[in-house]
């Protein structure tokens, strides 16, 4: 069974799909459980007689009652009774499987009057576990004894615990074994001797490569064919190109690739493949442990593997691949050595000890703008004896005692000097190929120190010049310099000791800079504490538990130093294939071995099948509107330079309890009414068990005499952070009535605007001030229609829960032409909106109510959303950005260069944006949708959804109409809100918007760079577009702007702007009560870790404090950032936010 729980309460009050009765063979009413069942479902005893050791299903009074007859141990032997008890439970399990019952309430059989006077709780419980493990039902065990409850709970806990066989073994379930030459060696979570041998390497730069390699192995089941494709992938071929070569359309879910295929230097690990691919390598070497087809593959050379790994569970500890040997005494003790290596080749390559050369360095300065910082692969240690060469000024971090700075600002003339070497280590060096150049690592200079401290990342310094290194062969290497003093005499350095390596030099030369041409991993970028389930798709993120609102794959960045236009290419999706037989097979596997991995595989297949069925249903329902896919208009999208930010320096406390206390101290100092807020849990939730109530929009009546029982049981963890944020609303009658009573829509308009004239002016302003004037004719000639591809793409991209909801809604589907598009449903929003402040303690939390559109309208028409977004991005001016399909990193790349200290930024906050959209704005939206090319047939449907709303006054039956307003949760809500947001900015700002270097819009949120408000802006909004607007003038670095739940801050170290989450909002959210049994804390912790890493950037710390003090007028914000970093460090720390479980209404006494 997926889950076992125990409850100490009356079984007749259960909420499960079926109940098991501890019956007797005659089918008559007895005592205990039998009497409770008879009292609640009296008809269930008709024809209930069944022999001992069997069970019988009776459906009565709307309930599935399973009568199971256990043995009476007073009348049978122990062995016979034990057999019959097991048989009774097996019979119950058989009925559950045959009837597809998903949850069952069950007592322990033969533990009461049939127990023969002995304690048979554990005996009965073991048989129950054995039988129920073969079912797919959630099992709730009911008892009335406190000692029994404790025993059963301990037994359930033991089933989920991990037992250590030996005391010597340390439990490291998330340890991953990596290649000895991997850069992950020594980092937490990775080992060269122990751990899992298959992983997607989540949280590293090699994750995407690992996922791609796993997909290739799935597309080509034959190992040699898959390896051939992996070689082509390493040589630069794209995944799309590889997928098109696959002979079959669909493939199974992938499994993680090997992390250690072998121990030789040519092991084709995800890390090596990633580096080869990143360096645009044209020829690679693979070893024999990576089998390939017999024929030759261009650019791939095969060698014999000299260190085959036999996968044994007890791996001997490996000898370090490096052995340091003493060097011969140098005659020039005061000369500096800078190493260059001749022998290189694969991503694993190390310098050979026979190829070290001594270089004499002469400084000579050249001035020009550098490209990107050079790779820093091997550190040449240079000890300075005569003078301190370099001084780094204006450092924003504590200076470490050992600082390493690249010597770039020099033209280095290399003279080869023979190194004294014993014949034991002298190896022949193959002649270098003419086409390639010897790589020279970037030399570094080290300041000598008498003591050691932990290293601190050095800040980036703006570069002003470039230099080159010239070898005796006349080959130049460009190096990008950092801030460096010009030297007037040669630098004398000491030769580094040679290193013995356990392999032969490799006969391949790699271009300088081959190793790391992409940006470096910054300290704090990777969370090595991530919990990996062991397969893709293990986490389905929600907004609170995953990376925030802007979470997508980065698609708007590139490694070039300037903005470039690219042809917009749709990400290819693979339609789900229906395979019910495989779903049943995976379900059976999961039942036999109920591990997380098996459960995940089964759920993935189940969701795929659901999606396939949904697509067929929707295509069938929309067939009168369905058309062939027309040729898409090519559009272009800008990509921006990948920004560089200062490194994160961890600043946290040791004790998480101190961190919680620091959060509460901050709240007490800045929000005293919040910290001291007290509320009684059992306030007034009794209205949800009322009989005979009459509920209307404006009143509710009931009879207090008809109160039947306590409210439903509600349990939650008492929050330790005292931010007094209420938990989500319970779906009780009282709250639903409050919601129904609250929804007093704006039934009268403030005044009648000239609807048509206003809409035409809105559209003209939009096209004049926010658009580039292209594409309108092409859009008109190529209308957007519902196509098979639209529907398929939309459904394929749905996450599991959304797919399940749509699957339920499309059952007995109404055709699109019969969907009532003008209908909307008043729905209750369960979550309480969290805003930092005291409002939530000064008044009772109000139930938020939304007007949801007809679900089927959303299901049919969501398919056109992607094409609408693509077209809108194509027509908008290059300075205006919408955040659709964009990651947080993409947004950072867009704003990085534009937002500088002292720049003015305009924020506008529109009150009740959805409700304020009247007829003129609805018409504006329809006209713009028509201009973007939406087909006339679809426009008719959308017009019905956007138009006037018809309502009925329930007490009198009076029908009335009121003006249009946007319905939340509709198929185009976010798109149209964003469109109208830009329209309003165009009407009010006009040329100021056009001339702004950067403006961003999403929904009702916007920021416009370089604009200051004037006294008429708010009045124009009120009179021209009927919107009540609050205008905020922000200034970078003084009062930083706020957008999308975060601040736009300026990184003082790198000179780039970025958006970071609001720490105060995050702190308030940590005080939200969590329902008992929630299992998403690891996701929440990881999401918080990502945010704390950004807050810890060296160049942002002071900026963040300015932002919080200017926006919220609070002090001591450094303490809460430090406290949240402590809580995010580990799951154990994060759990300190959760106090004891509070039970309301009917919990354990």
Curated annotation (Swiss-Prot):
Site entry (Cleavage), positions: 538-539
Residues of the Macro domain: 1-160
A molecular function GO annotation: nucleotide binding
Residues holding ADP-D-ribose: 10, 24, 32, 112-114
Post-translational modification: Polyprotein P1234: Specific enzymatic cleavages in vivo yield mature proteins. The processing of the polyprotein is temporally regulated. In early stages (1.7 hpi), P1234 is first cleaved in trans through its nsP2 protease activity, releasing P123' and nsP4, which associate to form the early replication complex. At the same time, P1234 is also cut at the nsP1/nsP2 site early in infection but with lower efficiency.
GO BP: DNA-templated transcription; viral RNA genome replication
Residues recorded with modification Phosphothreonine: 344
Reactions catalysed according to its record: RNA(n) + a ribonucleoside 5'-triphosphate = RNA(n+1) + diphosphate; 4-O-(ADP-D-ribosyl)-L-aspartyl-[protein] + H2O = L-aspartyl-[protein] + ADP-D-ribose + H(+); 5-O-(ADP-D-ribosyl)-L-glutamyl-[protein] + H2O = L-glutamyl-[protein] + ADP-D-ribose + H(+); RNA(n) + ATP = RNA(n)-3'-adenine ribonucleotide + diphosphate
Function in brief: Polyprotein P1234: Inactive precursor of the viral replicase, which is activated by cleavages carried out by the viral protease nsP2.
Protein name per UniProt: Polyprotein nsP1234
